[in-house]
């Protein structure tokens, strides 16, 4: 089977990751101890992608849990699904990274990385035909950002031909945890551009907006945000976990979604987004799902797709839905909003349908877009970075761990290059496209 090894690093990465395992265990009929209690053969047909079948019919996640301090790990162990994970796959330090990217990447993280890679290799060896890795982490902290990107480069070194996909939580000024987030995020994006194959950008600001506006929550906590992220992760990985045709592995998804290797940062969305407790009172049609899914208010990334253009889009519908309805609705969206799709990639919207609906819903749709409007998000981080870096504010925390100012300048210019690449393709017409293809 085409296995995927899941790595979660840092506090945010571990919390989001655990929610993901809770969600997909529910969908595959796996209980909290790893026993199968489901009812459908489809649940087991591709279970080996994410789970290893151990002795006595216990299903164990192919997950490695990493942190530079023991607190989050203890919380995971004591949580509802703590017994699901293999005890040897918890790898943690004692010192923490103190929200410092340099500690995660160069000092504390570098000391722990060999033990992490040993576990990763062991998981890879127990795979039959490994397709790749997925990482959940945040870009604003020390461990998820610094050590997460160190892990990324080590995996790229050891497994050069496997796919690496990241679910990266991007910091936002409205929901700020630390003042040095713009530094940590810019240094991380510098690494993601070079080493990741696919990055789903999840944005705390957008998640909070969804909680307030759509779900009508007065005081959303991280639990609510992580629930939203797990909906998207479950939707995005549906094609990998259940029998289906389109985008059935990480590489096919990448081939459909990434026209230029550096532009692999995706916006994700989900429909229906409904307040908890109201799902029983409403059924949705395919057209409502499609409209919601393309609505910027449903995007988990704080950028407005109407301000840019879509290079490519993938949509995953779930539930008892006719393929014909889906195709009709999707082509309607495209013809109504034709100016939002670049015309030089002819069939740039791909659709998949999976019979198995997510738990508690009759049908759902997950949206993945490669849109040039994501430059808003990079621009926001880059502007904050520049303001601080010009004054060299807080730099001593990084140089004290052995980093060089040069590395900051390189990360800044890589970010600026990325912005201008997105802008170039946003403005491009069919005539220009012929030039790209010639180059």
Swiss-Prot record:
**Family assignment from sequence similarity:** Belongs to the tubulin family.
Q: Which Gene Ontology terms describe the biological processes this protein takes part in?
A: microtubule-based process
Q: Where in the cell is it found?
A: Cytoplasm, Cytoskeleton
Tell me how this protein assembles: Dimer of alpha and beta chains. A typical microtubule is a hollow water-filled tube with an outer diameter of 25 nm and an inner diameter of 15 nM. Alpha-beta heterodimers associate head-to-tail to form protofilaments running lengthwise along the microtubule wall with the beta-tubulin subunit facing the microtubule plus end conferring a structural polarity. Microtubules usually have 13 protofilaments but different protofilament numbers can be found in some organisms and specialized cells.
Show the GO MF annotations.
GTP binding; GTPase activity; metal ion binding; structural constituent of cytoskeleton
- Pfam families linked: Tubulin, Tubulin_C
- What is this protein for, i.e. what is its function? Tubulin is the major constituent of microtubules, a cylinder consisting of laterally associated linear protofilaments composed of alpha- and beta-tubulin heterodimers. Microtubules grow by the addition of GTP-tubulin dimers to the microtubule end, where a stabilizing cap forms. Below the cap, tubulin dimers are in GDP-bound state, owing to GTPase activity of alpha-tubulin.
Which cofactor names does the annotation list?
Mg(2+)
- Enumerate the residues binding Mg(2+): 69
Q: Which InterPro entries match?
A: Beta-tubulin_BS, Beta_tubulin, Tub_FtsZ_C, Tubulin, Tubulin/FtsZ-like_C, Tubulin/FtsZ_2-layer-sand-dom, Tubulin/FtsZ_GTPase_sf, Tubulin_C
The beginning of the lineage is: Eukaryota, Fungi, Fungi incertae sedis, Microsporidia, Unikaryonidae
Mind naming one GO cellular-component term on file for this protein? Answer: cytoplasm
Give residues annotated as binding GTP: 11, 69, 138, 142-144, 204, 226
Q: Which domain of life is it from?
A: Eukaryota
Transmembrane residue ranges: none
Question: Coiled-coil segments, which residues?
Answer: none
Q: What is its main location?
A: cytoplasm
What organism is this sequence from?
Encephalitozoon cuniculi (strain GB-M1) (Microsporidian parasite)
How is this protein named in the record? Tubulin beta chain
Q: Extract the SUPFAM superfamilies matched here.
A: Tubulin C-terminal domain-like, Tubulin nucleotide-binding domain-like
What SMART domains does this protein's entry cite?
A: Tubulin, Tubulin_C
**What keywords are assigned to this protein?**
Cytoplasm, Cytoskeleton, GTP-binding, Magnesium, Metal-binding, Microtubule, Nucleotide-binding
